[in-house]
């Protein structure tokens, strides 16, 4: 990451308080999440981000299993992630997320992870598409889900 990009992210994080984010999930780092040195393996941050998005939807009353039964699902279309600091075994992390933009058949989640000292250790931007699972083609979000997400946003 370029120094300019990192400075922009730090400035953005300073201007975005936790209250700007609609959901926060605390996650403990387990041994299974780390490499032999006790540092979180970078791809596991993707799992942490996914858990926060899934738990937020569950809290909003959106049951993803029920959605799958209708032949529709949410898939990650695009990810942009920056690892800024390491996370270590047994640390308690906070995963924050908000919807940056809602579209007819996709949404963009803005997420970041902080450590126990409140320092941002990882940031992510995720484009989630709503697709017809049989055709693997984009479809409009079901109306009830779209309404819940608009209210939450």
Feature map (PLM): residue ranges:
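Hot-dog-fold acyl-thioester-processing enzymes
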Residues: 2-77, 132-153
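A structural signal for beta-strand boundary/capping segments at domain termini and interdomain linkers
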Residues: 120-121, 138
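Hydrophobic beta-strand-centered segment that forms part of the acyl-chain substrate-binding groove
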Residues: 56-108, 121-123, 128
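A generic structural motif
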Residues: 84, 114-116, 131
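A short, structured loop/turn motif at beta-sheet edges
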Residues: 16-18, 115-119
